[in-house]
Amino acid sequence: MSDYKSLKVAELREKLAEKGLSTAGNKAELVSRLTAATESNDENTSNNNATDLGDLAPPEDDIDWGDMENDTISTDVNKPAEPESKETSAPAAAVEIEKENESIISKETSQAPETSTGAEEHQETTEESKQSVSNEVSSPDVAKEQEKLIQRAKRFGIPVDDEQIKKAARAARFGIQQPLASSNNKNHNQSKNPQNRSNSRSKQRNKNAPPKSAPSKRKSNILDDPIEAEKARKRAERFGVAAKN
């Protein structure tokens, strides 16, 4: 029948299996087999109704088969309702993705100021440490010590070294031995005593002079030994050679 042609092969095979018929063959064979089975069933039912009802049974031509076609059409029309649910769910998924992206962006923006504040704090600490060091170097105590050392160097006619004076002033402030004062006193004592000055010059001259060679010892001769000399003389007489003095 015409309504079987609109069905799929799988549906046709299901109907044939329900009726106990063979499901082998292509779609046309399945449709023809199914229509033949339905026609035979309809004939049997009509015959039974005719025997039961007699003249009250309607003829086959008066049976309206349009209701069955409408049923199949209504089922076909109602089937494409599923993709609509998928289409409606797609915008909802897109909205959820947009919300997730917005939350990620908000987290990144909230974390960015924390890193900037950490860099600013580090910069402030470095500036404070530099300022504290400069305050230590330029404190009034260090300036006073520098002035004292400069005046002392001028008094004894010693050349002034700014870097050495700074180190000595810093050492005096923290209670460390002052290398500048000790070196200045040493130079002053050497310049004041001429004997010390001459001794230092002689020491310097001795350092620069080449080392003196040790006196060479006279090589010992074998003939200096009287025993060895006698042996040599006898050997010379034996071989007819004149003995060496």
From Swiss-Prot:
<dbReference type="GO" id="GO:0016973">
    <property type="term" value="P:poly(A)+ mRNA export from nucleus"/>
</dbReference>
<dbReference type="InterPro" id="IPR003034">
    <property type="entry name" value="SAP_dom"/>
</dbReference>
<keyword id="KW-0597">Phosphoprotein</keyword>
<feature type="compositionally biased region" description="Acidic residues">
    <location>
        <begin position="58"/>
        <end position="70"/>
    </location>
</feature>
<feature type="compositionally biased region" description="Low complexity">
    <location>
        <begin position="182"/>
        <end position="196"/>
    </location>
</feature>
<dbReference type="Pfam" id="PF02037">
    <property type="entry name" value="SAP"/>
</dbReference>
<dbReference type="InterPro" id="IPR036361">
    <property type="entry name" value="SAP_dom_sf"/>
</dbReference>
<dbReference type="GO" id="GO:0005634">
    <property type="term" value="C:nucleus"/>
</dbReference>
<feature type="compositionally biased region" description="Low complexity">
    <location>
        <begin position="37"/>
        <end position="52"/>
    </location>
</feature>
<dbReference type="InterPro" id="IPR040746">
    <property type="entry name" value="THO1_MOS11_C"/>
</dbReference>
<feature type="domain" description="SAP">
    <location>
        <begin position="4"/>
        <end position="38"/>
    </location>
</feature>
<dbReference type="Pfam" id="PF18592">
    <property type="entry name" value="Tho1_MOS11_C"/>
</dbReference>
<feature type="compositionally biased region" description="Polar residues">
    <location>
        <begin position="109"/>
        <end position="118"/>
    </location>
</feature>
<dbReference type="InterPro" id="IPR052240">
    <property type="entry name" value="SAP_domain_ribonucleoprotein"/>
</dbReference>
<comment type="similarity">
    <text>Belongs to the SAP domain-containing ribonucleoprotein family.</text>
</comment>
<feature type="modified residue" description="Phosphoserine">
    <location>
        <position position="139"/>
    </location>
</feature>
<protein>
    <recommendedName>
        <fullName>Protein mlo1</fullName>
    </recommendedName>
</protein>
<feature type="compositionally biased region" description="Basic and acidic residues">
    <location>
        <begin position="119"/>
        <end position="130"/>
    </location>
</feature>
<feature type="region of interest" description="Disordered">
    <location>
        <begin position="32"/>
        <end position="245"/>
    </location>
</feature>
